[in-house]
UniProtKB/Swiss-Prot annotation:
This is 4-oxalocrotonate decarboxylase. Optimum pH is 7.5. Stable in the range of pH 5.0-8.0. Forms a complex with AmnF. It is an enzyme of class 4 (lyase). One of its GO terms (cellular component) is cytoplasm.
Length: 256
């Protein structure tokens, strides 16, 4: 079956760190089929012992939505094998086109499902933290269509989470600086995430429900990028400082 075959191909690309062609011609798929491919892709990881630990949101800036010709967000799944310890290191040989972006992460203390208000979403939050996501499209030349990126787990490949803070901490408009070896490479604000990151959490509950899923207690939700993603290179220290939330870091090894 085409859906299963594509999921296997994308899984092999992620495991090997080797690029794969876009889903064109006989492999072209619809958005609905792409969502099923993503589910099967993650199932391969779970079969190898990983656990699903949350979701990541994508297209959380109006500019990115316009670029992709869409009017809504997309989401991908976070698994335990994607979690990079704060202060740890990653081997870039395991990635295809690795890039990093600063984010806000929510930890849910209660189940969240369906159409909820921002206040209801906040009531389900147990803690908030600064975070970074490592994105890595498995497609050649980092080029993809909307179905392509959905099938490829919304390009999500890894994430780092900093120290947790009380849920009432205001994260709606916090300054963020991402640096490589002490040199700033991106400056931004959490307000770039849909005007406020809580809107991404609201959207996560809605979009998950559309596929028959809920955001369970204990889930991590990456709200989306606060700046453009920056390409990673070997042998650097990556640091993100977030106003009022502190900093987090990781380093890179390997060859590209």
């Amino acid at each position: 079956m085409k859906i299963s075959r594509i999921a296997q191909r994308l899984d092999e690309a992620a495991v090997s760190g080797k690029a794969t062609p876009q889903l064109t011609g006989d492999d072209a798929v619809t958005v609905r089929e792409a969502a099923e491919i993503q589910r099967l892709l993650i199932a391969h990881r779970i079969e190898r012992g990983a656990r699903q630990v949350g979701l990541k949101m994508g297209f959380t800036s109006r500019a990115k939505m316009a670029q992709m010709g869409v009017s809504d967000l997309i989401w991908g799944r976070l698994t335990s094998d994607m979690w990079v310890e704060e202060g740890g290191e990653i081997d870039l040989a395991h990635y295809v086109h690795p890039r990093v972006e600063p984010e806000i992460c929510y930890l849910l203390g209660k189940r969240l499902e369906g159409n909820v208000t921002p206040l209801e979403a906040l009531a389900a939050v147990e803690a908030v933290a600064p975070a970074m996501e490592i994105i890595d499209s498995r497609y050649r030349d980092f080029k993809f269509s909307l179905p392509d990126v959905i099938a490829d787990n919304a390009s999500s490949s890894g994430f780092v989470v900093g120290a947790w803070h009380k849920p009432e901490t205001d994260v709606s408009n916090l300054g963020m600086v991402m640096s490589f070896d002490g040199r700033a490479v991106e400056l931004g604000t959490s307000a770039a995430i849909l005007g406020s990151p809580i809107r991404a959490l609201v959207a996560a509950a809605r979009l998950a429900a559309q596929q028959g899923e809920a955001l369970e207690a204990g889930s991590l939700i990456l709200a989306g990028a606060a700046t453009a993603a920056v390409a990673l290179r070997p042998g650097i220290s990556v640091r993100c400082e977030v106003q009022n939330l502190g900093s987090l870091s990781f380093s890179t090894t390997g060859e590209r």
